[in-house]
């Protein structure tokens, strides 16, 4: 299913999330199962299925990584069950530095400063990747789509690192 069509957007990485939320509410009102309570069982089942599609579409389009994955899937590149790893040497080196920094936080003289520095580093790198991804997804070229898939892999890794950093920060605050 093309969620961009469902929500009446042109396939693009940058979408107006306020408009997305508004269209989500409109679609929810139109297909909500309560609206079909007195209809046939088939109509009620169809309403439940349609509601699930609307919910999944909304969750997909509001999350930048899932939105990018969806755009790539529409172009025949499925990253959902993939085991391909990032081959970018510079990124792998950066990844190792971040991992070491995560391990060193607890022994740091000022753990919160180390955490803040890592958050800043993640944000700067994520911004750089997002700019590349936006340009690559807007291109119609197959090569750019493959490069965009690499950016998505990197962003997924960074999301895991961010979650790990949040867990470390929460543990230090306890």
Swiss-Prot record:
Annotated keywords: Chaperone
Q: Which Pfam families match?
A: HSCB_C
Q: Cellular component per GO?
A: iron-sulfur cluster transfer complex
GO MF entry, a single one: ATPase activator activity
Q: Which GO terms describe its biological process?
A: [2Fe-2S] cluster assembly; protein complex oligomerization; protein folding
The protein's superkingdom reads: Bacteria
Question: Which CDD domains does this UniProt record tie to the protein?
Answer: DnaJ
Under InterPro entries, the record lists: DnaJ_domain (IPR001623), HscB (IPR004640), HscB_C_sf (IPR036386), HscB_oligo_C (IPR009073), J_dom_sf (IPR036869)
Annotated J domain residues: 2-74
| SUPFAM superfamilies listed in its UniProt record | Chaperone J-domain, HSC20 (HSCB), C-terminal oligomerisation domain
Functional note = Co-chaperone involved in the maturation of iron-sulfur cluster-containing proteins. Seems to help targeting proteins to be folded toward HscA.
* SUBUNIT field: Interacts with HscA and stimulates its ATPase activity.
Family of the protein in this entry: Belongs to the HscB family.
Name this polypeptide is given? Co-chaperone protein HscB homolog
Source organism per entry reads Shewanella sp. (strain ANA-3)
């Amino acid at each position: 299913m093309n969620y961009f069509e469902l929500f009446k957007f042109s396939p693009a990485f940058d979408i107006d999330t306020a408009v997305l939320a508004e269209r989500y509410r409109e679609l929810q009102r139109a297909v909500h199962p309560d609206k079909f309570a007195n209809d046939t069982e088939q109509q009620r089942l169809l309403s439940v299925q349609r509601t699930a599609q609307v919910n999944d579409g909304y969750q997909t389009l509001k999350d930048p990584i899932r939105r990018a994955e969806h755009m790539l899937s529409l172009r025949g590149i499925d990253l959902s069950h993939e085991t391909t790893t990032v081959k970018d040497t510079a990124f792998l080196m950066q990844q190792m530095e971040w991992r070491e920094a995560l391990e060193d936080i607890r022994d740091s003289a000022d753990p919160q400063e180390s955490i803040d520095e890592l958050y800043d580093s993640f944000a700067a790198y994520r911004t750089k990747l997002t700019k590349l991804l936006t340009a690559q997804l807007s291109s119609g070229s197959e090569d750019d789509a493959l490069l965009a898939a690499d950016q998505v892999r990197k962003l997924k890794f960074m999301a895991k690192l961010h979650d790990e950093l949040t867990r470390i920060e929460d543990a230090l605050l306890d």
